[in-house]
């Protein structure tokens, strides 16, 4: 883009229009949406802060755009000079403005994706453009299985109704956007979608324009920064809000679409309401691994809160159902029940309901039955509320629902009766939707998983054995531990009494088990043991559950994360299955969790991905040998560095036979908003998971050939070696990492309740995977994603040039390898080593500059080798739409990168001299108050010069929005 053209451009959206490819399809509204939102925002910025500040925003954007054109580092310096000349208040406003513009760009993109999707559905075109790499549609999957793969419709239906996808919401601290802003973003999205509807009237348009202006201004006027860290209860409430807003209604709507898709392949049955197609679990308030803020009291609170929320949502729907169920014809079975209830209800207290507040006559039998359901739901909700507030309730247990079977029974009775009286069409309306909600969400809304480190259980058992004076459990061999645990599990005597000496940590573990015993069993899902390495880790949890009187013990799930643990996992699980007591206990079913984050941090992405692939194959073979059905629980993050990527591609690239209709997967942090933030996103997410799980089971991907395996094994060794050589053995690395990235400042964002380190001191090993990825994402260098790939590819090609052809063939024909390469290519497209070079120049000591240069040379070499294997000349050659979307963001992100680098310089070096130009934000009528200065007052206790800390945090949030992930 020539400089003279840039000088003539009046606004940012004019530059955006220059980025439009020569030919854009009619349904491509992205530029239009983007420009509309930005025009509105820049007008708001001018109204609030004056023309001078708006011009500074445009000047920064233009310098960034010039840099993006030629990657001339001088442009970054010019941009840095503009940004460092701003006074503290203006600096905050500029960082906030660019962060806000990136959020608006994301919203424009989401509306555009939904628009393209609708266009495709209208055309009946599912395989258009990028859909092959981003979508997995249930109807298209059914048609593909029946018509292309010659599966019978009955086979498809049978596989579908027996499959389960369990989505596990976790409070991983990667959601950097406050809930207050997420809600405003949702309203902006709605306004934008409605503005581009075909049948909009002029009055509608005017009102929507006003609403859009109002919401954009409200979002900009909201403090983006969390001033205090969230508690686990805050995280749980935030996670559960998605159920209230989209998931609750989204599940029956999705299942109705599945019914329609089945009808279109010739199946005239509906998916049974109790078929477990979709289930939801949570770690919010249950994941205590490294988080001291998750206490037994927190676990109890979140379970009761979820129960109260579930009862409240059912209660709010039951009167609508009563209105619909006005029929008088019913089966004898239902009539007898209705008459009994009518007689007994006259003696009960009358509750002051809004509708049906008087006793329902027996001539409306369905309403009588549902009226009793309403009473019990009311009591269920109130009892949970009392227990939450006061620990006791005077509502007797017999007047509430304590398990889901009690709740389903009267609803099933109504359904059977309607069908028996020829009213199936009515039964299959709202009543079926309600039954499906009850079957999906139960009384607990989600099932809470408990996660704890194996060492904490060892501490408890060591205290017990020392108290019993039989030795130190911690010092026993694995054989001796197993022998003692099995002997105790087979016996009946209590293992310890109230006189057991307890440290605070031991009491915490035991009190957690007591909470499991106290609350209804349907509150809980799995008990996950992190850092599990041997059968005794699993048996220890079984014994502690028994000793604490957990009536229905939770299934125990070992979690294997690091490379060595993944390699040893199949043997460990085989030893576990060899124990007769345990084999009888699990009834032919076992779950194993595999961790993507820590394995990547431990060995690099290539080696971790390959070891995760092999571990799954071997674990499935072990399970088959012992006659056990194994469910894999995938602990995937949102970023590629932590196992993220498009959902259906991730599923379809898993090894054959490793899913077979049963899948658990974590949905973490910002991914929850991206997957469930809107109704259409929720619908699309449920489609992707269900369709891809079905397709993987009925049309498994190919197995790798022996020569591919051998090459992958060799390359993984080299990749791990180079990765560890640099990350763990290179003496300069830790210092370089801490200086070149904002890792040390990450904790100031107050994203999550969990500390960023497992141990307060220590190096890279003790750093959690999220801040590790976060730090490199902020500098757009993405080192954890690509490091090791270059060494592996170079070794393979130099060893034998034929290996290049083999790698190219693997890319074309093997889904696992293709997905692995494509995701790294996407990360390279988001990367920019020029930003890393600027950080080095400003923040890193001169003696480390050569080290930074060698890493950037490695980056370029790896990128070129990757393109050669993919057969691409340029990054994202095969996905021009994604490339366009990323280009639209680059200039905003670059401004924030430069702002961040110079702000870090000023924070870390208080002697760094800058010269402020005059204050440019306009003043209010009274001269003492400047709007930009008001921002400084939001953080009066900062330990740095005024405005620096907030400017830094705003750049972090903006870059996270631009990269569309945090950690």
From Swiss-Prot:
Activated by the allosteric regulator glucose-6-phosphate. Inhibited by malate and aspartate. Up regulated by light-reversible phosphorylation. One of its GO terms (cellular component) is apoplast. Keywords: Carbon dioxide fixation, Cytoplasm, Lyase, Magnesium, Phosphoprotein. D-glucose 6-phosphate binds at residues 283, 451, 598, 636, 666, 754, 768-770. Disulfide bonds: none annotated. SUPFAM superfamilies: Phosphoenolpyruvate/pyruvate domain (SSF51621). L-aspartate binds at residues 642, 674, 830, 889, 965. It is an enzyme of class 4 (lyase). One of its GO terms (molecular function) is phosphoenolpyruvate carboxylase activity. It catalyses: oxaloacetate + phosphate = phosphoenolpyruvate + hydrogencarbonate. Its cofactor is Mg(2+). Its EC number is 4.1.1.31. Transmembrane segments: none annotated. The active site is at residues 172, 601, 642. Through the carboxylation of phosphoenolpyruvate (PEP) it forms oxaloacetate, a four-carbon dicarboxylic acid source for the tricarboxylic acid cycle. Homotetramer. PANTHER family: PHOSPHOENOLPYRUVATE CARBOXYLASE, PHOSPHOENOLPYRUVATE CARBOXYLASE 3. Belongs to the PEPCase type 1 family. This is Phosphoenolpyruvate carboxylase 2. It comes from Flaveria trinervia (Clustered yellowtops). The lineage of its organism: Eukaryota, Viridiplantae, Streptophyta, Embryophyta, Tracheophyta.
